[in-house]
Amino acid sequence: MKKFFTEAFEKMNAADRESFYRTVFMNDTSEYAQRKRNEYYKSVLRRMGKNVNIGVGVKIENPELITIGDNVKICDGATLIARPESEIFVGNNTVINDRVYLDTEQKDGYIHVGDSVYIGTGTTLFGHKGLEIGDHVLMAQNITLTPYSHIFEDPTANIITQGGHSKCVTIGRDAYIGMRVTIMYSGDIGEGSVIGAGSVVVKPIPPYSVAVGNPARVIRRRGKENEDS
């Protein structure tokens, strides 16, 4: 089997080789397919570090705009989309879990993920004007982050035509974002903060805060008693 694939590959032009990789190796769980995926991605990504593991069914658009650090794991079914003139950077020792969706969304957007970050299954992250995730951030499952807010003030115009506002959103180092949290436009998360499961963040959260609810509000500082007591 290996000889057959090697001989067939050597006869292909560049476009056919890319199609061949996508068809044959992207959804194959064998160790050989894993090695071939790594070879392919190393040749097309802006940079791919050492000891990177890219799972089956991963979708990467515009790989020349994407940098992957050392010891990174991108799990099955993840999607990384870098729009033209944007970029995605993933730091060292980071895990992007199953079915995570990263999309810069627009040409001047970007997503920068720091070192030793864990992004949980089913999380969706957009980077319209920039998304910066600090080192050692822990993100649980099914989080949604979109640094964009629709304009809807004109009742005579369709909302879909009114555009919106976008800004860079930052998540400080060592923050913990609970499962099913939604982070909206202006929802910066301070260093060392904890956001409780199911919360909706619509305004900045100060460093070392514990915040919960919809909308999320600070209930205490880490290391201090409950602010309501």
Language-model-detected regions and their locations in the chain:
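Long amphipathic N-terminal alpha/beta scaffold segment
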Residues: R47, N53-E64
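Flexible, glycine/small-residue-enriched loop-and-beta-strand segment within the central core
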Residues: K59-I68, I74-G187, N214, R222-S229
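Terminal amphipathic alpha-helical/low-complexity segments used for targeting or macromolecular assembly
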Residues: M1-N51, H136, N142-I143, S149-T156, ...
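A short, structure-level motif marking secondary-structure boundaries and short turns
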Residues: R22, A33-Q34, N53-G55, C75-D76, ...
